[in-house]
Structures are given as C-alpha cells and as structure tokens.
From Swiss-Prot:
The gene is ospZ. Belongs to the NleE/OspZ family. Monomer. Its main location: secreted. Coiled coil: none annotated. One of its GO terms (biological process) is methylation. It is found in: Secreted; Host cytoplasm; Host nucleus. Its EC number is 2.1.1.-. Cysteine methyltransferase effector that inhibits host cell NF-kappa-B activation by preventing nuclear translocation of host protein RELA/p65. Acts by mediating cysteine methylation of host proteins TAB2 and TAB3: methylation of a conserved cysteine residue of the RanBP2-type zinc finger (NZF) of TAB2 and TAB3 disrupts zinc-binding, thereby inactivating the ubiquitin chain-binding activity of TAB2 and TAB3, leading to NF-kappa-B inactivation. Also mediates cysteine methylation of host protein ZRANB3, inactivating its ability to bind ubiquitin chains. It is an enzyme of class 2 (transferase). S-adenosyl-L-methionine binds at residues 92, 98, 107, 111, 204, 208. Keywords: Host cytoplasm, Host nucleus, Methyltransferase, S-adenosyl-L-methionine, Secreted, Toxin, Transferase, Virulence. This is Cysteine S-methyltransferase OspZ. Residues 49-52 are annotated as: Interaction with host proteins TAB2, TAB3 and ZRANB3.
Length: 230
C-alpha cells in the first residue's frame, strides 16, 4: 500500500531558507535520511549544497520562481462551483494543465508528477486557499513524486483522491499477479481494468474515456498477435 501524505490544510507562506523545513511543511513524514543525502540532479535546479539539510535555496530558481508561480496561480484561482462539467484529456495532459484545471474550478481533483520535492509549483499550490495535495513516491523511480491535488471546498475532492489512491494500489497488485508477463503487457492489462473509473475520477469526457480504452484494447491485440507469430 502506498502511504500518501496530505499537506497541512492551511500551509502558511514560508519565511525561511531552511531546506529541510520547507519540505516537511508540505510532506511531514518524509524520511529523515532523505535530508542527509546529496541533492540529486533535479534538486540542484532549486537548492545548492553538499547535503539537502545543509543546502541553500536558490534565490532566482526557487524563491523568486515560487513567488511568480504563486501570483500566477492566484490570478487563475476560482471558488469551487456547485457542479463540474467534463473536461478534455488534452486540458490536463501536462502538469500545469492538471493542477490548473483544479485551482480554476473545472474539476475537483487532478494528478501530476514532480522530479523534486523542491519544485516551486508544488510549494506554491500548497499555499492556495482550499487546495490540498497528497504526495507519495512514484514506484520504481528514484526521484519522481506523484502529486494528487484536490479541492477542500468540494466533498468530491478528497473522496476522488482517496479512490484514486485505491485504484493505484489495485493496479500495482494486478501487475504483481501478472509478474510473469512482459512489462508492456502488464502495464496495458492493468490499465484496461482501471481506465474507465480512473477517467471518471479525473472528470474526462465519456467519449474520450471510450476512445482511450479502445486504444488500449487495440494495443493489447497487437501485442498478442506479435506473440502468436513468435
């Protein structure tokens, strides 16, 4: 089971250069040993130092960039509507689109990944009113983190977030059951099983969900056809 951590409901603006504190502020249960490690190549975009707990925040790349991103997010922020309408997958196909559709009130929940816990967008999001994030490491990756961003002012926000996490675990369990299959086949089979409900959680239009599932089924058929030839 993954162990996501929800950020504090109201994360206050950070007036410190302590690189350990700013991460714990949004991800309280991060392992202590994480800060004794050297910054990875992605962290180095935002901090500099021998270890993370001894590092300094970069003025332009983190502090100023977070301020710019937070100002932009505030201009795009909208209170939660009473009803949500389906969105196109294209609107959420990149990280900014994923969180922008949430903070602008188009949908109650979205998901994206960051390559560093010092990513300015992540820290800016956590300072917005009625916006929360759940964070957990991406499986089989040394640096990626999955961020589930959701609305606190809609009951659908956390409900959908929790169900997303359940489906994520289900997919992992399916892939474990299929451990003797090829990585490609495991990925497609598990995706087909959860694709419809996952698409509905993300508020995608039903016709786009249908199209995506057909695409996955076609890929599955192509793989099976190749395997039958060999």
């Amino acid at each position: 089971m993954i162990s996501p951590i929800k950020n504090i409901k109201n994360v206050f603006p950070i007036n410190t250069a302590n690189t350990e504190y700013i991460v714990r502020n949004i991800y309280p249960r991060v392992e202590h040993g994480y800060f004794n490690e050297s910054p990875n190549i992605y962290d180095k975009k935002y901090i500099s130092g021998i270890t993370r707990n001894m590092a300094q925040l970069k003025i332009e790349e983190f502090i100023n960039e977070k301020s710019r991103r937070l100002n932009y997010m505030k201009t795009m922020y909208s209170p939660c509507p009473e009803d949500f309408q389906p969105i196109s997958r294209d609107e959420a196909s990149i990280p900014e689109g994923s969180w922008l559709t949430v903070i602008s009130g188009k949908r109650p929940m979205g998901q994206f990944s960051v390559d560093s816990l010092y990513h300015p967008d992540l820290h800016a999001l956590c300072e917005l009113p009625e916006i929360s994030c759940k964070i957990f490491p991406k499986e089989n990756s040394d640096f990626l983190y999955i961020i589930v961003v959701f609305r606190n002012d809609s009951p659908q926000g956390e409900l959908r977030t929790n169900r997303f996490i359940e489906l994520y675990d289900i997919k992992r369990e399916i892939m474990q059951v299929l451990r003797d299959e090829s990585p490609e086949l495991k990925s497609i089979k598990s995706e087909i099983i959860i694709a419809r409900e996952m698409g509905e959680l993300f508020s995608y239009a039903s016709e786009e969900i249908d199209s995506y599932i057909k695409q996955m089924n076609d890929r599955f058929s192509q793989i099976k056809a190749r395997m039958s030839v060999t």
